Structure formats: structure tokens, C-alpha cells
């Protein structure tokens, strides 16, 4: 199991009973062995749970709840409704519709963080900066709100100096980044 930045995982010292239940807030990647007698369950906010049948998967609760299945099989459960995911699918709990939506995805951008990479595929600068602010402990201010909607693509190392990342972004966008302490100011060129 791998835990991303700003993640909390609660689990018992020893799993007793008929289930292995953990409680997650944040993002984690799991590689779980199959055990029919004691299934593994990841419990999250809004009474959403992932039941695992021996698999590798990523769970993210930073902004809502989503599960991306790499291999094996999992089901997402909420309010008595269960949706089975196949490899290369993402399940998203939609609180407004009180349901789970499933879509096919390229899993790499969702799981690259565990190997020390950021992979962005036509992702909004707002979403990218949310990830970077968690990882680097930054506050982000946009001098022009439209910049949040600029879309970027690229592969970057998570352990690079943040200034290097911003220089890379400046080469491929109209955004400019100025860092003062732990605060990033983003403006238009």
C-alpha cells in the first residue's frame, strides 16, 4: 500500500472477524491479496466503500470519491447500490445524483504518483495546481481566474524542484508563476 500526501488511513492492529476493513481519507494505492474468507474493504466518506477481490487499485477522496482499477476486480458500494469495476475503469461517486458512474480510462495518470511521477493528460491547470499544492505544501493564487481552465499535458518527476516544474509550464502555456515563500502567484503572460 502507498499513501499520497495529506492522506489518513485508519486500520486495526489486527484484523479480526470476517472482513479486513480500513478507513481512508485522501489517496492510496492498494495491492491486495485475494482472501475469500476475509474480504478487504476500503471505507470512505458518504458511506462509500470499495470491496476488493484481490487486485491493484487506486482510491482518491480529495475531491469526491473515485476508484481506478489497475488489475483484478473491485466493486464500489454506496447506499446499498453496488457497481463492479473492470481493469482500466474508474468509478466515481456523484453525490448530487446519489450514484456511481463508471468510465474507461488510461490508468497511468491516476497511479503514476506512487512511482514518483506526475502525468497530466489535457488536465486543467486548476486540477494540476491542486495536486502540486498538496504535494509541495503550497498556497495558490490566480491573478486571473480563467487560468484555472487552461489545459496542459506532460510527464514530470514529483521530486523535482517546484521552480523547475513551473518553468516547464511556462514554456507550454501563457501562464507565469511567481513563488514567494510557500505561495504561488499565477498570472497571464
Where do the PLM segments sit?
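A residue-level detector for the "anchor" residue at the start of short, highly conserved motifs
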Residues: 1-189
